[in-house]
Amino acid sequence: MRLPWELLVLQSFMLCLADDYTLHGPVFVQEPSHVMFPLDSEEKKVKLSCEVKGNPKPHIRWKINGTDVDIGMDFRYSVVDGSLLINNPNKTQDAGTYQCIATNSFGTIVSREAKLQFAYLENFKTRTRSTVSVRRGQGMVLLCGPPPHSGELSYAWIFNEYPSYQDNRRFVSQETGNLYIAKVEKSDVGNYTCVVTNTVTNHKVLGPPTPLILRNDGVMGEYEPKIEVQFPETVPAEKGTTVKLECFALGNPVPTILWRRADGKPIARKARRHKSNGILEIPNFQQEDAGSYECVAENSRGKNVAKGQLTFYAQPNWVQIINDIHVAMEESVFWECKANGRPKPTYRWLKNGDPLLTRDRIQIEQGTLNITIVNLSDAGMYQCVAENKHGVIFSSAELSVIAESPDFSRTLLKRVTLVKVGGEVVIECKPKASPRPVYTWRKGREILRENERITISEDGNLRIINVTKSDAGSYTCIATNHFGTASSTGNVIVKDPTKVMVPPSSMDVTVGESIVLPCQVTHDHSLDIVFTWTFNGHLIDFDKDGDHFERVGGQDSAGDLMIRNIQLKHAGKYVCMVQTSVDKLSVAADLIVRGPPGPPEAVTIDEITDTTAQLSWRPGPDNHSPITMYVIQARTPFSVGWQAVNTVPDLVDGKTFTATVVGLNPWVEYEFRTVAANVIGIGEPSRPSEKRRTEEALPEVTPANVSGGGGSKSELVITWETVPEELQNGRGFGYVVAFRPHGKMIWMLTVLASADASRYVFRNESVRPFSPFEVKVGVFNNKGEGPFSPTTLVYSAEEEPTKPPASIFARSLSATDIEVFWASPIGKNRGRIQGYEVKYWRHDDKEENAKKIRTVGNQTSTKITNLKGSALYHLSVKAYNSAGTGPSSATVNVTTRKPPPSQPPGNIIWNSSDSKIILNWDQVKALDNESEVKGYKVLYRWNRQSSTSVIETNKTSVELSLPFDEDYIIEIKPFSDGGDGSSSEQIRIPKISNSYARGSGASTSNACTLSAISTIMISLTARSSL
């Protein structure tokens, strides 16, 4: 067997082999849990799980009821990957409490305890039961008496071979299995059988039937409830579980069940009630659910109460566990574990599976363990055990004691340490060593002695203050403990300090200006130097804020800052920070920025009338330039943004903080703001004042564009533009309409009490058509009447024409166009004529779907287009005016011409010579339903122009003279009485050269260039049209 120190040396050696091969004590991955094993299980095998990791691999053994399980002596036992397997388990031999014990070279840990129990359910011993005889109306209890068993049971009853259902009369207790009938009725007579089920094995057994009969000696009278099923006086309940309380009473009439808490608190909302309130179920039981509960059974004869106390308990639960500790020799170890539980847990400690007691260097107090002056024998596996009467929990940790000589291999002294003259330097010395070593220092070959400048700390660090050039050199730290000595050497280089030669100075500038803040230094040129600037404590980002900030200077000893287009937000403290690898320093300057004033504050409406408002405010910041004036602005729901307003005084100087706004509109909601100005500019506006409405006043603005006319017979229609709301001057705004026949003296008046009214119709049979009236419209509101608008002349409604147009005639112009003619109505016509309305429809369409077109004035003909070819159309004409249309003329008929040819000219061939183009094409023949071809139209234009010229010919060829060089686009289409037919594809003819050229419409890729022309000569008989 190795000594403890040998194990420690071996452990230290193995730790160095590989980072991914860490040696450690056993750690439980999975601990055994309680097992309820069904005796009738087909598997015939029990597994108690235990999984452990550790390096070296731990050895696993098991205990039952505190005694080692001898795997070799009983073939039924085997351990597979740490778990215990029991073949053909026996409830007599194998039931008990098991623990898993894991051990490797670092120590031993024990698992939590796990109980192995066996679930079974035997058959009922008796086969028959005595008959139960009861009176009608009497309460009854049928006993179940379950047979021997292990494991939780559930109960049900069968009544005459059918399941007995539960209601407010019947109740089956899941605690006793008994069947309770609160009040027996005739329908309850029969055989009752108790059914018992083991919830673990699902095995079910039936008890012997119990016959129930009714007695013949009368009926049971009414009586108060008698509680037969009630919960115990004390019911312990575990945290987080579901608690069920049962309560049922016999009685006549059938009692009702009510639950309540004795302390008056409401039962938790999560609680549920089942079986006609016979069961109170509380899920996820917590401390606040504990207390005294009452079951109240009540009927018309009285009530009874059953009481019981629900007590709360909780198994221990870790709040703070212990963790592995690696400690050097002669140091101390302190562990603390904490657990919650009800009742409060007690603590004990184990080392390598054995109890640990207080002695000498080891102090144990509840959940704390303190070991002083640690040595190698203290290494091992430790466990804190917390327990109460409801459970036990374990927390494990490993204590490693490190013993090694000083080693600098991973913590060498810094090779070079830079320091400035007059500065301070600390050289760290942190070798790995256990126990802590003793430190000495050398400079070169001389041992360093501590003095007022040189000190050596307890942890070995060397500190030198007020450094001089003579302190440069090599320094060696020597560490020594019981196991050996080691050293490490580093060099100190002393540099000249950095000094600021031209610092930035505080400045006073105006918005928009640009400045440079200097920052120039002298420094040791063997060191790199870095300049940084902060503004009000924040680092300036020259990339993000490059619009305003830029580093300038160009020399490594200058870090000047340029600030361009300075704004108010740039006022504040600027700090230049200079840093080298040996020192850093900073210098600061304040920048004051003068600019337009800030917004005034607390704009208040002190008094308001119908047209004025008295304002006051407090001045805002003047931004280092005195305020010279204030401007008042106002806004209403009707204005476009903020508008400057007139004030008294006219100009509000910078020392005045009140003003009267004049020229306001009455009964309008206003809000005001103030803008300050100084010699630099106009500042930001203040926040708006509260909204206030001016007082009411008489209206002053009259309606605009008073006019009218039109309407129906015997009507005078008067219209006007409404007065805008902001000019109505008060509530109750409306209009007064005044009118009289032209030349009369007496006005007729009508009042319209609506601000939105814009039209009035006077209807009277005495009103003659198209009679002149003098009209004016006035205004009023709740304050009184305002002025009237100027008088204007309005005509009454006219009468629609009374005579139809005469001499209606229509003719066809083409397949799509017809022309209609008519004459003015004959005889005296009472209504004036403003124009005519032509109605037309195709013979195949209905007249109500007819289309209409109108003419204006005295025009007595019109052209109708976009018609269908070869179609019969019906037409009629009416005269119209503002009153409507007059009677219709007689209907006339006209048929459009056949459609023009649909076939375009084909086989177009052209050739050119001596500035002439000759075109030839095939004759177009019309179809039977098309108009005969009368000739052809040749359309041509310059390639770069949109205007087109047209040549008509009755032949199938044409000759063009084109004196200028230009590309041409040419099309050809036939025409007939029905109109123009389909056009050929466009032909592009390029510029004409002296050489002979030719081409065809089928292919324009051979086309030659044509010259632009100003005159076209046709060599054959044709007529030209534009």
From Swiss-Prot:
Residues 599-697, 702-799, 804-899, 900-995 form the Fibronectin type-III domain. SMART domains: FN3 (SM00060), IG (SM00409), IGc2 (SM00408). It is a lipid-anchor; GPI-anchor. Residues 32-117, 122-207, 225-311, 316-400, 406-493, 497-586 form the Ig-like C2-type domain. Disulfide bonds join 50-100, 144-194, 247-295, 337-384, 429-477, 519-576. Residues 1-18 form the signal peptide. GO terms for biological process: brain development; cell adhesion; negative regulation of neuron differentiation; nervous system development; neuron projection development. InterPro entries: CNTN4_Ig6, FN3_dom, FN3_sf, Ig-like_dom, Ig-like_dom_sf, Ig-like_fold, Ig_I-set, Ig_sub. A lipid is attached at residue 1000 (GPI-anchor amidated serine). It is found in: Cell membrane; Secreted. GO terms for cellular component: extracellular region; plasma membrane; side of membrane. Its main location: membrane. Expressed in the region of developing olfactory neurons. Isoform 2 is expressed in mature sensory cells of the vomeronasal neuroepithelium and at lower level in olfactory neuroepithelium. Belongs to the immunoglobulin superfamily. Contactin family. Interacts with PTPRG. This is Contactin-4.
